[in-house]
From Swiss-Prot:
GO terms for biological process: aggregation involved in sorocarp development; chemotaxis to cAMP; phosphatidylinositol phosphate biosynthetic process; phosphatidylinositol-mediated signaling; response to Gram-positive bacterium. Residues 895-1164 form the PI3K/PI4K catalytic domain. It comes from Dictyostelium discoideum (Social amoeba). Residues 75-84 have a biased composition (Basic residues). The gene is pikD. This is Phosphatidylinositol 4-kinase.
Length: 1180
């Protein structure tokens, strides 16, 4: 051979081979110290070995101990496998007895890097109760998103379990969908923040040029364009993307003034090409004339290696350093745009192992190269550059450049070589590292976002097909591929539209017996666990944006038009399933398909059991279309509520209430059938049938516009399962059996009668006057509903067409008389929803100001008209009784929740239904509700612990439904009032103790003592929770009291480590003012001693199960970024310290009593109440 190779392949089979290898390495060291000349006597030393597992690659100048290192590695691997087996055996033994959902979630997080344990635990979760799994749905989604291998996360057993739960539980599926959507929105926001950081740290960008983005201005971006922008060419810093790498150019003033790029110099190019060819052959030679070398990829060399076979070899191995007086150019071509290489690159940055995966790939590629001129292209060439070129003064060092920094820059990106050595006061180096770090972070965030999108789409398909979708495409199928017509939609707070899945392959379903471990599928998906390259096309569904409408020809008896209004039974009409028909249009109109005929409900109840048949089942395809539309209706409804909150923000405060009523009235008119909101604890399905506009209310907020809604729902006796969802929806109609036709006429007559209109207004006049800024006149109340409602003439022909069409359908279809009459009854009842709320002249967005102005100027006339109307409408005995009951209720709480339920049950068109219910919710938009959801989840765990130990401590958790990264729906607590409103609304209020005396009677009586005990038990419970979780912002607006005397805390925006204004003003462990102590009877009373005992016992029992609290918080810390985790790992350490784990129970009792003594009437607590009173007007 003509040249001495830098890479020597050594294969050892015995101790004698080791000695020979050591001698060969010593000879190689001597050769490297001598001048590099062509020496045919020094050839590559290769010992043939039949054992391929012991083959290693070593660099010139490095000692080799192949057998010993291999033996050590084998011992380490065996010890790891032994430990994993011990862990597995201990877990199997642990789970052989009793286990619960918390144990599974905790061990899933602890052993998340062990696939075997994860598979075992996921199989165990199939045996748990659904309610226990649903409680930890957020943690399960976080564990899935944060799995070690992002691209393989959708293959994992955890993903299969979640998708199986989505296929079986409609409630679980919708919640999981919104959680993954929130992760997707988080990724989009993070990508924009990284882009802003790139612009901010660029020398060519001034602060005024940094783009400001809002949540509504989110568009897809490509970070590669940032690095290809020409604006960097005119500055002291240049960063361009060349096959995924960086090019950093530092220019002197001469080149900057001439505005001439270095690469445009022809002399420079000639020298570069010549030196590049020379330096490949003589990379470590002592040539003093080589003063113009550059670090460039070996593109011009005749002996260059193919980029596809050696992607990293050219960038890392053919690096030649040039020392030039004026110009230094560094070209780092280190990464490829393929996902597999990005994953490999990111894995090197973790520095978990000393050997880089990139290094192994390059060694394998170089080992297969027999070209003698390419022997210098190995991954250890960087060491030769540092040790030979630099140390032997082969480069002109007049520039005083630290070449360790140059090599550090290479190693920072590639994960190879020496760490980065930062130079003080060097802005170029700092910017370089920031941009490199941002690029790597950008890629990782983008992968997380894509994974969240993929999982969200899988949740959609699980609901629509009632089974877990296949991750890989079917081997042989005559039907289209799964999800071929799906579209992921627009991101960034906008609604993700789901297209009708008429082309979804029926073979994409999996039977119920198929749980997790599918050997055949795993073999098809991943052939080699060590292979980091995963083809995304194998499991990412194909999304097409053009196929938005699917046309299917159906028989005559099932034909209907595109809009779902007209029904034609004479001819075969195609069904056009349009993606725009899900209600994303303006004006709050929500169109739905397939719910106007009871026959469609029958056809869509349950998919066929033979879901894997190759025949194209039309009924099953039609059911999938209806499921898609049903899911669209629910998502569109929630999105519309969030949109209402946004459009109220720019409106003046005094006009918001009228505008909110108007928007809710429009939404109420077009309310689709069977809307399901999975907010409450019950797993049974329910149907939202009406939203009374007169009960809506704007809540106090300085920056957002949250509002309160009252929902009329009909609960079902069945669970919200994906397979029987339409059976449940159709079961709501069975409550109107028996003389259905007569009942339909009675409802119509009742609706159009003057008596019903007067009754409705009479019962709701009080709430209308208090909540609305616009008044109701006599002329408005006596006007016909058809004349007052602008949208009613559209709804009436709609019902007529359906009624007429249903008669023809009943003749051609084998529908029972009960079903057909029930359908007509439902339609007439649905039409009867809107006119009562429209009897008031609702102001349009254009004339809102005019209406309010008229109301303000004519205050006296309005009052007189309202009084007259009340007197006129109070003729009915029933309505007069209701009004008298409202007047007699002089409690500061006003009308109780049960009284309101009875009142609406009498006047609601759906009040005759046996399972009719009334709920109230708060819609929040613009705030991330996930932190508050976590706080309520922790409170639920405390409540569970104390109930198990039978401690009389009272906590009132409430439900929070996260619908996006910036919004949610919150359950309200009925019959409660904040201490602020209690003091404000109670005439002559003095102290809380006097209120208890006036409300519950004599302090020695049973009612007072019961209310006092409720107050003490709730105060003790929330005092412990407030201290453990460090809940701040405890003013009287965030503390509620109910009619029974319980204290309830709400609004957990500041917990663990954050506080209002980032100022730790509330330094007391919990709020215990003198006013609260007086209700307990004073410090020396026996009731206050009872309070102390409850606090001590509560903390002692809680610290016995501290792992349930700690593990939940640790999992949440690995999820979305929340302000309560700004303290990092110290949050967990401080949380453990507050449980007093290092002391016994006696010492713990003393510490708790000290906390109570310290909190009594603390001066900072009083000052914070004064501050809130001065700033926000909250009563002290």
């Amino acid at each position: 051979m003509n040249k001495i190779s830098d890479t020597i392949i050594i294969t050892s089979t015995s101790n004698e081979d080791e000695v020979d290898n050591n001698n060969n390495n010593n000879n190689l060291k001597e050769i490297d110290r001598s001048p590099r000349v062509n020496n045919n006597n020094n050839n590559i030393l290769t010992n043939v070995n039949n054992n391929k597992n012991n083959t290693i690659t070593s660099s010139g100048g490095s000692d080799s101990s192949s057998s010993s290192s291999n033996n050590n590695n084998n011992k380490i691997k065996k010890s790891k496998k032994h430990k994993e087996k011990e862990h597995m055996d201990s877990i199997v033994k642990l789970y052989s007895g009793k286990f619960d959902s918390w144990m599974v979630i905790c061990h899933l997080f602890k052993y998340r890097d062990n696939p075997g344990i994860v598979d075992f635990l996921c199989n165990k979760m199939y045996n748990l109760e659904d309610k226990d799994i649903d409680f930890y749905i957020t943690q399960l989604c976080i564990l899935l998103i944060n799995q070690p291998h992002d691209q393989k996360a959708s293959f994992s057993s955890l993903a299969r379990f979640i998708l199986d739960r989505c296929a079986s539980s409609f409630r679980f599926a919708i919640k999981a969908y919104w959680i993954f959507q929130a992760f997707e929105e988080d990724g989009e926001k993070n990508l924009f923040s990284i882009e802003g950081s790139v612009y901010l740290h660029s020398p060519s960008t001034s602060p005024k040029d940094v783009p400001m983005y809002s949540n509504d201005q989110i568009v897809p971006i490509d970070l590669d364009k940032i690095y290809n922008q020409s604006q960097y060419d005119d500055d002291d810093f240049d960063l361009s993307d060349d096959d995924g790498g960086f090019e950093i150019i530092k220019k002197n003033d001469h080149h900057y003034e001439n505005d001439h790029h270095i690469e445009n110099d022809p002399k420079k190019d000639i020298n570069s090409n010549n030196n590049n060819n020379n330096n490949i052959n003589n990379n470590n030679s002592n040539n003093d004339d080589n003063n113009n070398n550059e670090i460039l990829p070996n593109e011009n060399s005749d002996n260059s290696i193919n980029d596809e076979n050696n992607q990293y070899g050219n960038s890392n191995n053919n690096n030649n350093i040039s020392g030039e007086n004026d110009n230094i150019k560094i070209d780092i071509n280190s990464q490829n745009k393929s996902d597999s290489n990005i994953e490999t690159l990111n894995s090197t940055l973790c520095e978990e192992t000393k050997t880089s995966p990139i290094k192994d790939d390059m060694e394998n590629n170089n080992n297969n190269n027999n070209n003698n001129n390419n022997n210098n292209n190995n991954n250890n060439n960087n060491n030769n550059i540092n040790n030979n070129n630099i140390n032997n003064n082969n480069i002109n060092n007049n520039n005083n450049i630290n070449y360790g920094h140059i090599n550090g820059s290479l190693s920072t990106l590639d994960g190879i070589g020496q760490p980065y050595i930062s130079q003080p006061n060097d802005p170029i180096e700092n910017i370089t590292q920031i941009l490199k770090r941002n690029r790597i972070i950008y890629k990782k965030v983008e992968e997380k976002k894509e994974l969240a999108t993929r999982l969200r789409e899988f949740c959609e398909m699980s609901v629509i097909t009632c089974s877990r979708p296949l991750i890989t495409r079917p081997r042989t199928s005559s039907l289209p591929s799964p999800l071929i017509s799906y579209n992921s939609g627009k991101i960034g707070g906008n609604y993700h539209k789901i297209l009708s899945p008429s082309s979804v392959d029926s073979t994409s379903l999996i039977s119920e017996d198929d749980k997790i471990i599918e050997k055949e599928e795993e073999d098809n998906v991943v052939e080699d666990d060590d292979d980091d390259e995963v083809n995304s096309e194998d499991f990412i569904p194909t999304a097409t944006t053009t196929a938005t409408t699917t046309t299917t020809t159906i028989p005559n008896h099932l034909s209907k038009t595109t809009s779902g209004v007209g029904i034609n039974s004479n001819s075969s009409t195609p069904i056009n399933i349009n993606s725009a028909g899900a209600g994303a249009g303006g004006g709050g109109e929500i169109n739905h398909i397939g719910y106007d005929d009871i026959s469609y409900l029958d056809k869509c109840k349950t998919p066929p059991a033979e879901s894997k048949l190759s025949d194209h089942d039309f009924e099953f395809e039609l059911s999938k279309s209806h499921r898609c539309d049903y899911l669209n209706d629910i998502l569109s409804f929630i999105q519309k509520l969030a949109h209402i909150s946004k459009i109220l923000l720019p409106i003046p405060i005094d006009l918001r209430q009228a505008k909110l009523k108007h928007e809710i009235s429009l939404l109420n008119i077009n309310l689709p059938l069977g809307l399901y909101v999975p907010l409450w604890q019950s797993s049974n399905h329910h149907c939202v049938v009406r939203i009374p506009p007169e009960e809506v209310k704007i809540l106090n907020s300085r920056e957002r516009v949250p509002f309160l809604l009252v929902l009329e729902v009909i609960e079902s006796e069945h669970e919200a399962l994906s397979s029987n969802i339409f059976e449940v929806v159709s079961s709501y109609l069975q409550y109107t059996t028996g003389n259905s036709a007569l009942k339909k006429d009675d409802i119509k007559r009742k609706y159009y009668s003057e008596k019903f209109k007067k009754s409705f207004l009479n019962s709701s006049i009080n709430s209308t006057i208090s909540n609305s800024s616009d008044s109701c006149t006599t002329e408005t109340t006596t006007t016909s509903p058809v004349a007052t409602s602008p949208t009613l003439p559209i709804n009436i022909p709609h019902s007529k067409l359906i009624n007429d069409g249903s008669n023809s359908i009943s003749k051609s279809l084998p529908v029972t008389p009960t079903q057909s009459t029930v359908l007509n009854n439902l339609i007439s009842t649905s039409t009867a929803i809107s006119p009562p709320s429209q009897q008031q002249q609702l102001p349009s967005p254009s004339n809102t100001t005019t209406t309010t102005t008229t109301t303000t100027t004519n205050t006296n006339n309005t009052t007189t008209t309202t009084t007259t109307t009340t007197t006129t409408l109070s003729t009915s005995p029933t309505n007069e009784k209701i009004l008298n009951e409202n007047k007699q209720n002089s409690s500061p709480f006003g009308e109780s929740w049960q009284e309101k339920i009875e009142r609406y049950k009498k006047i609601s068109p759906f009040g005759d239904y046996p399972n009719w219910r009334l709920y109230s919710v708060i819609v929040k938009t613009g705030d991330d509700c996930r932190q508050e959801q976590m706080a309520v989840q922790l409170i639920s765990k405390f409540d569970e612990i104390w109930k198990e130990t039978r401690l009389p401590l009272y906590l009132r958790p409430y439900s929070i439904l996260v619908t996006s990264s910036g919004g949610g729906i919150i359950e309200t607590i009925p019959d409660t009032m904040s201490l602020h409103n209690l003091k404000k609304s109670t005439p002559g209020f003095t102290t809380l103790l006097n209120y208890f005396k006036s409300t519950y009677g004599d302090p020695s009586g049973l009612r007072f003592r019961t209310a006092q005990s409720n107050f003490i038990e709730s105060m003790a419970a929330y005092s412990i929770v407030t201290y453990i979780l460090q809940i701040k912002d405890r003013h009287n607006g965030n503390i509620l009291i109910d009619k029974e005397g319980h204290i309830v805390h709400i609004d957990f925006g500041f917990i663990l480590s954050n506080s209002p204004g980032n100022i730790s003003f509330e330094s007391a462990p919990f709020k215990l003012t003198q006013e609260l102590v007086d209700v307990m009877g004073g410090i020396q009373s026996g009731q206050f001693q009872y309070f102390k005992v409850l606090c001590v016992r509560g903390l002692i029992e809680a610290r016995k199960q501290v792992d349930k609290i700690i593990s939940l918080i640790e999992i949440m810390m690995s999820g979305p970024k929340m302000s309560c985790f700004v303290g990092g790992k110290e949050v967990i350490e401080q949380l453990k310290a507050r449980f007093f784990l290092d002391v016994n129970e006696r010492e713990c009792s003393t510490l708790v009593e000290n906390l109570i003594s310290y909190s009594i009437d603390h001066f900072k607590t009083r000052y914070y109440d004064k501050y809130q009173s001065w700033l926000n007007g909250i009563y002290q």
